[in-house]
Regions:
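Bacterial N-terminal signal peptides that target proteins for export
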Residues: 1-8
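C-terminal segment of classical bacterial N-terminal signal peptides
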Residues: 14-22
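Boundary/entry segment of secreted carbohydrate-active catalytic domains
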Residues: 24-73, 101
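Aromatic-lined carbohydrate-recognition surfaces of secreted/lumenal glycan-active proteins
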Residues: 29-39, 96-104, 167-191, 206, ...
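Aromatic-lined substrate-binding rim segments of carbohydrate-active enzymes
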Residues: 52-55, 63-103, 110-115, 145-173, ...
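An active-site-proximal structural segment forming one wall of the substrate-binding cleft
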Residues: 109-135, 152-165, 189-202, 266-280
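Active-site groove signature of glycoside hydrolases
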Residues: 120-150, 174-180, 204-218, 285-293
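Substrate-binding cleft of secreted/luminal carbohydrate-active enzymes
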Residues: 213-216, 244-324
């Protein structure tokens, strides 16, 4: 017969080990990814390396620096890239890219990968350790540009991911898709269907999911909401799929057409998006600050008025909480 004291001692020991294990488990902190505007043949990206002292404070808050693979191919020499990747190692910055998986210039996953693989190999030869790639909206491209079915998008995206996993097995692979042009339910269905197809192929599923939110449409068109988006974040977390959110100046193009946009528009817009999502307790796993709209006009310094790195610095100070 087991005596009561023995049971009590065993229970106490189990509880102590349970508490200790959870106390020792480190919290996964949110990360900051940045991609500066690409105008003037990627001048802003080049400035980050040629003027490193002008963004030291911001750099300490950044985890991942990225741009498009095509931008690296077009704009920068091998000598520049070799030097920059060395600097990134010294700064403990990870390197990532946005890439095509289904595009008008590559309508199948195999075709896209065949065109991009030489770009990536060139970067690796220059010293890059490619941490992650994010596929640039294959579902959107399939629907809106090559006019194929969602089933086609699933199959060709899965084919692309399979190629990446085979040739670059250590690389994280995520997907970017648009909201609110696709509903929350459509996003959930897309993720589940794509991951199931990958599983059927014996290929690891998505490593993260990134939302490109045209949040101006929430009020201008009454389509979508931060509340609904927060539900997608929760759903991803339940699926143990890291959720990333792009922060950008959604209203900049419309303001520019009306002669209302300047560099302050970028800054105030991403801060507004930060407040809007934080005020409903939105907490993405990665805060992705990215400009593809040619603004702001200056990347540096990070204490300058309305510069890109200033916006990153102030945003990260305000919204990126490492205890979340």
């Amino acid at each position: 017969m087991i005596r009561f004291p023995t049971i009590l001692i065993a229970a106490t020991a189990w509880l102590a080990s349970f508490v200790a294990a959870h106390a020792q488990a480190p919290k996964v902190r949110p990360t900051v990814w940045i991609s500066p505007p690409g105008q003037e043949k990627g001048r802003a990206f080049r400035d980050l390396f040629e003027r490193p002292d002008d963004w030291k404070e911001t750099r300490a808050m950044v985890d991942v620096l990225f741009a498009t693979d095509l931008g690296f191919q077009r704009n920068y020499s091998d000598e520049e890239l070799t030097r920059w990747f060395g600097q990134m190692r010294d700064w403990n910055l990870k390197f990532a890219m946005e890439v095509g998986a289904i595009k008008e210039w590559g309508k199948t996953g195999a075709e896209c990968f065949a065109k991009e693989q030489p770009y990536w190999q060139r970067l690796q030869k220059a010293g890059a350790k490619i941490y992650a790639i994010a596929m640039d909206e294959p579902l959107v491209c399939t629907r809106e540009h090559i006019h194929e079915s969602d089933e086609y998008a699933v199959e060709e995206t899965a084919n692309y991911v399979a190629q990446v996993r085979q040739h670059f097995p250590e690389m994280l692979v995520g997907d970017i898709e648009a909201y609110p042009s696709s509903s929350v339910e459509e996003h959930e269905h897309w993720i589940e269907t794509l991951n199931k197809r990958l599983a059927d192929k014996g290929v690891r599923g998505l490593d993260f999911y990134r939302l490109d939110v045209d949040w101006l449409r929430f009020n201008a068109q009454g389509k979508g909401s931060w509340k609904d988006l927060r539900e997608l974040e929760r759903w991803c977390r339940q699926k143990k799929l890291p959720f990333q959110l792009i922060y950008w100046a959604s209203g900049y193009p419309a303001a520019s057409k009306r002669g209302l946009a300047d560099d302050s528009t970028w800054y105030t817009a991403i801060m507004q998006q930060g407040y809007d999502y934080a005020l409903i307790d939105g907490k993405p796993d990665a805060y992705v600050i990215e400009s593809w709209i040619g603004a702001p006009s200056q990347c540096l310094p990070d204490n300058g008025e309305w510069t890109f790195t200033r916006s990153v610095r102030d945003f990260a100070r305000k919204f990126v909480k490492h205890d979340q």
